[in-house]
Regions:
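Contiguous, glycine/small-aliphatic-enriched amphipathic segments in soluble metabolic enzymes
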Residues: 1-100, 138, 142-222, 226-251, ...
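Short secondary-structure boundary/capping segments
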Residues: 104-105, 115-116, 158
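Conserved hydrophobic/aromatic beta-strand scaffold that supports enzyme active sites
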Residues: 103, 114, 123-125, 248-250
Length: 312
């Protein structure tokens, strides 16, 4: 379990998760982070003043992620739960990644996808942390087919769904309305969905309602905010971020660093606890006879942590 950005609420929600009875019963946890984060459930850490050095915080966040991945690839731990990081601080600290998902994919040389999941809804993002102006160029038949493959494998391996029902959310209003509002849905998304063997594309204003009613096991959203809005409206505070495609389970809470309330004992640990318990359930599933440690038969060298790209 990484503490995330030590200036934020990460250390607090980690400490609260460690103190949770369910977590204590189900998990043995190694905390990875700077000693100064003061994680303790047995004694007071006394008075402290959070650092304002964003670059240092980002550097420490990145080092913790690197170390956690090394431990997971070596088999020292069964999975990783990550507390929130500050993306700008991560970059200032020398790590040229938009966030956890991309960094984890690079470190493990894996093709990954971001899933947000709750007991009501599962959403996978076909594109993640890019400007809206770049979404159309980033969406390709290959990227959608790959997102569907990773989603299908994740639903089978981690959630135990033998025949996953996956749908693709449309890009344009009303799915383009026969080309009146754009041709991408008919010319790109529909052929890609057919090639991937998934349903859709269906308009965003109905697809998530259908998924909430149980028609689909997961929805692939074409861009970040349409998917994030749906999951957070449905399950704010209880959803879990999952990186699909890694050779080990990785989860995190569905919120950010909340720098404005750090150190005030106001942080709600619910999502962190949910992330920890879900990671534990994935790890237990992988240990069962026939369980899989990850997603496919990648070469042996892909199991060794790669050195991440650094910002200049």
């Amino acid at each position: 379990m990484t503490v995330g950005d030590p200036r934020g609420i990460g250390p607090e929600i980690v400490a609260k998760a460690l103190a949770d009875p369910q977590v204590g019963e189900r998990c043995d946890i190694a905390v990875v982070g700077p000693e100064g984060a003061g994680i303790s459930v047995d004694e007071s850490v006394g008075r402290w003043v959070p650092s304002s050095d964003a670059a240092l915080a980002g550097r420490l966040s990145g080092l913790a992620i690197e170390r956690a991945v090394e431990m997971a690839l070596a088999g020292a731990v069964d999975g990783i739960v990550t507390a929130p990081i500050d993306k700008a601080a991560l970059h200032a600290g020398g790590y040229d990644f938009p966030g956890h998902t991309e960094m984890l994919g690079s470190l493990t040389r894996s093709r990954v996808a971001m899933m947000l999941a709750s007991d009501k809804l599962r959403v996978v993002l076909a594109t993640t942390h890019i400007p809206l102006s770049r979404v159309i160029e980033a969406l390709t038949t290959e990227s959608i087919v790959e997102a569907a493959r990773i989603t299908r494998d994740g639903l089978r391996d981690w959630f135990g769904i033998a025949e996953p029902r996956i749908a693709l959310c449309a890009l344009n209003p009303h799915g383009g309305d026969s080309g009146r509002f754009g041709n991408e849905d008919t010319e790109l998304l529909a052929p890609a969905a057919s090639a991937a063997g998934i349903a859709g594309p269906f308009p965003a204003d109905t697809i998530f309602v259908r998924a909430l009613r149980g028609e689909f096991d997961a929805v692939i959203a074409p861009y970040h905010d349409v998917g994030m809005t749906a999951i957070k409206v449905a399950s704010f505070g209880s959803a879990v971020n999952i990186t699909l495609g890694l050779p080990f389970p990785r989860t995190s809470p569905d919120h950010g660093t909340a720098l404005d309330i750090a150190g005030q004992d106001r942080a709600d640990p619910s999502s962190m606890i949910a992330a920890t318990l879900l990671c534990s359930s994935f790890a237990l599933r992988a240990r069962q006879p026939g369980g899989r440690q990850g997603y496919g038969d990648r070469p042996t060298e892909s199991r060794s942590a790669a050195r991440p790209s650094r910002a200049q």
